[in-house]
Amino acid sequence: MMRISIEGLKYLNSFSLLARPVKGGEPVKIQGWGMGSSGYWSTYYDEVEKGELVAFSLPAGEYEIYSFVATASAWGGPRTVSPEKNFSFPFRVQAGETAYLGNLLVRFRGDSGVASARVGTVWIDGQRKIAFEPIVRDTRSRDFKEMESRFPELKPDLVKVRLLK
């Protein structure tokens, strides 16, 4: 379980993370949020963080979150945006256990941040490059409260906290 958040992009229809087994295997898309989500990104530009608490299940093993996919309908037509280069946030899945991985916030910094991008850049419209930085935060105080209403079958006192690194 984790919160997937984004800040600094507008006109998004959906945002997902991509994970894969460290020792090879098929990638898995972790749907962060879409147009029907409570965290749907509005068509108005603001710097407010938007996101969604998500629960997902994977077989036991070592994984990494390595990329993201954003879809939008306002960058001159339907577009899909992904980073130019992958990043890596490893995590472990243990059989029979529910783990909280934290809040992965992908912060976009616009054209002006490209030269100083600490992690990566994406192309918008095939012409304009903007910077992003993924940041892991521990927001369990907020997330565990939300978990009780969104995922009542999960009990906070039984969830192992294993933040992404």
Residue map of PLM features:
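A short tyrosine-centered beta-strand micro-motif
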Residues: 58-66
